[in-house]
Amino acid sequence: MGLLAKIFGKKNVAERKGEPDMVVVPEDNEKMDWAIEKAGLTLWYFEASLKNPSPGQDYFSIKVMIIDGENGEHIWLTDPHFDDEGNLFGTVGNAPVNVHNVKLNQKIGIKRELISDWMIIENGRLIGGYTIRAIRDTIPDQDKMAFDQQVNLYIDEGVDHFKANLETPEGAILSLEKAYNYKDIHAAMDCKDFFEEAATLLSGMDMDLNKEVINETAELLKLSFIKNIEENGFPDFSGIQNAFPERKKIDETHWVITEVCWHADGGKSVQQLNTYKSPKGWVVLGPKGPKE
């Protein structure tokens, strides 16, 4: 019995001769759903890198959902490329288990909405590969090294390439850090919502809340934000690579985002940030509170 069959149970793993075993993941798996969503939100980076690879980038591969009647299977394609309309073409990279309308090494074309993951190896390190990470996250820590050896990949938190805009919580964090790097106080404040930050802060205190109290607290937070930058300068995020391994939903408009920062000197820091979906888009409220 292979490693994955031992970890997940034999009925949940398809063992394939000469190829890595395939883990069967339930359709309602929250981690896998987020992995597929994350792959879609960062697909632009894969496409840009595929079009103009940087030194050290190789092994471009992309995962797609193949549908055969009532059956479906996520399969990796090698040698991927896109046409002018965004349709994907590639070579089936592993032997299908549940579908029979494609076969190993077959060249196929498929619509981009069926893309479920992508991966690049950058200087020996896995970038993307979110569905691989979702499976790995369920493995006991003592078995992770053996898993990495079996799939023959170096896997850490990676580097995520969300677009720096207010369309996602992660994009809002990157937008704020970009504003810091450009020393643009107005752009930084556009990534904030001091009223909501005040409401969130005060909600954890044993006191009566009203709009006037929240507004006064919001004004204090705003003044403190500006004063801190004037006295201490802008935080420096230049040369930092970011990963966002986890989202925690508080409610429909509040998410706590875990950010990993890889520093130029090789160091790593981790922070958890409270984000909020405001009328203008996602904004950054501040570090996670003790009750979140």
Please state what every model-predicted region is:
Residues 8-57:
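OB/S1-fold single-stranded nucleic-acid-binding modules
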Residues 57-67, 240-244, 256:
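Long, contiguous regulatory modules within eukaryotic nuclear regulatory proteins
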